[in-house]
Every structure is written in structure tokens, then in C-alpha cells.
């Protein structure tokens, strides 16, 4: 994005709002919010921190640490949501089932939810959890943008081939709601593209256009 990056400026003002174990504990369903989801150890926290230029999520080498829906306020009407990491073997099955039940309820009922970023490890894409997230997004006609994370773990050609392969399958099954791209937090690859999606979902591009037209 341009030097006048609206996302960076907004996220510098971000503050922790609340953690919720279930939908009825979430903040009032108004304004706009964007959620970040991903199977445990898919690089979700690193992606969230990198995109926002803020340490909004605790980056940990122990997957499954985030077990609640964590809301961050950007301003009075915009929020980011860090969703629980799923699939780690050390997490008890009843807890996984609890997460799944309340995550589905959140995705299907939250009117203020403008879109979801789904992190997939490029070396292990389209897991059962990934497919479930895509199915839920499609059922709710909710935009979902896939970040194929850890792209730096593969050679450039191999990463491109992996992207094309996954893109074909995603377009066939969920093409009406899903888009995807390569992403690497350490190499800062794909940040501008992802930030553009985030800015659009949060209505920041509309505000810039209105300001331009009024000038």
C-alpha cells in the first residue's frame, strides 16, 4: 500500500477490548470487525502482528495457546478478532468441540463481521479445519481471504506451484467467497496485498475515496 497506509495508522491505536468464550460474551454486534483464523501453528499470530504493525497477538511456539475469541478495538466502530487456534494434539477433545461449536455460531450470526483471514501453512494446506472454515464462510456468504503462510519455507517456484494447486481447488469449491495469496511474516512477503484486503473490509478505502472526492 502507499506510504499513507490507513491500516498502520489505525492499528497503532489498537487496544485489547475483551475475550469471549462464546458468542453471548462478545462486544455489541455493531460497526465492522475482521477475524483471523487458522489451525494451530499455521502462523496466525505472526500474520496478525505483521499486518497490523502491532503486537496484538501473543506469538508463541506452543500452538493452541489462544483458546478464546480475543477482540481488539481499533476505534469506536472497528475491531479485529483473534480466533482460537485449532487442531493441536495436546488440546483435549471436549475443548476442541467447544471451540468448534462456538466458532460456527460466531461466524454464522455476527452481523458486523466483514470478512475472515484464514491462515494455511503452505506445506500443509487445506486441512480438515481449513475446509470447515471455508464451508462455514460459504454457508454465510462471508468473504474469506486465505494467507498461505510460511511461503519462505519453500523455494520460489515450489511456493508458486503450491499456490496454483490450492487456488484451483479453492476456486472450484469456494470460489464465490474465497481469495488467496502467498504470505511470509519473516520475509514480509504479501503484506501490501493483505493489508489492502483488510483496509477494504474495514471501510477505510471508502473513507479515502470520500475524502478524495470532497477535496
UniProtKB/Swiss-Prot annotation:
UniProt key word Iron: no
GO biological process, alphabetically ordered: division septum assembly
Coiled-coil stretches noted in the UniProt entry, renumbered to this chain: none
TM annotation in the entry: none
Keyword Iron appears in the UniProt entry: no
Xref: InterPro entries: G_ENGB_dom (IPR030393), GTP-bd (IPR006073), GTP-bd_ribosome_bio_YsxC (IPR019987), P-loop_NTPase (IPR027417)
GO MF annotation, one: metal ion binding
HAMAP family, A to Z: GTPase_EngB (MF_00321)
Family: Belongs to the TRAFAC class TrmE-Era-EngA-EngB-Septin-like GTPase superfamily. EngB GTPase family.
Record protein name field: Probable GTP-binding protein EngB
Amino acid at each position: 500500500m502507499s506510504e499513507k497506509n490507513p491500516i498502520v495508522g489505525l492499528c497503532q491505536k489498537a487496544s485489547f477490548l475483551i475475550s469471549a468464550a462464546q458468542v453471548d460474551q462478545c462486544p455489541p454486534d455493531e460497526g465492522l470487525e475482521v477475524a483471523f483464523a487458522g489451525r494451530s501453528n499455521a502462523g496466525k499470530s505472526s500474520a496478525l502482528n505483521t499486518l497490523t504493525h502491532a503486537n496484538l497477538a501473543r506469538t508463541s511456539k506452543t500452538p493452541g495457546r489462544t483458546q478464546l475469541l480475543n477482540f481488539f478495538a481499533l476505534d469506536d466502530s472497528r475491531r479485529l478478532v483473534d480466533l482460537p487456534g485449532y487442531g493441536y494434539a495436546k488440546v483435549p477433545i471436549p475443548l476442541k468441540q467447544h471451540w468448534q461449536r462456538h466458532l460456527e455460531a460466531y461466524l454464522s450470526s455476527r452481523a458486523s463481521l466483514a470478512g475472515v483471514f484464514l491462515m494455511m501453512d503452505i506445506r500443509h494446506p487445506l486441512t480438515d479445519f481449513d475446509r470447515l472454515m471455508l464451508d462455514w464462510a460459504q454457508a454465510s456468504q462471508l468473504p474469506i481471504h486465505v494467507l498461505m503462510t510460511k511461503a519462505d519455507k519453500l523455494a520460489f517456484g515450489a511456493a508458486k506451484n503450491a499456490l496454483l494447486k490450492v487456488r484451483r481447488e479453492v476456486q472450484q469449491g469456494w470460489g464465490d467467497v474465497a481469495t488467496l495469496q502467498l504470505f511470509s511474516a519473516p520475509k514480509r512477503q504479501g503484506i501490501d496485498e493483505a493489508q489492502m484486503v483488510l483496509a477494504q473490509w474495514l471501510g477505510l478505502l471508502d473513507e479515502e475515496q470520500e475524502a478524495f472526492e470532497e477535496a
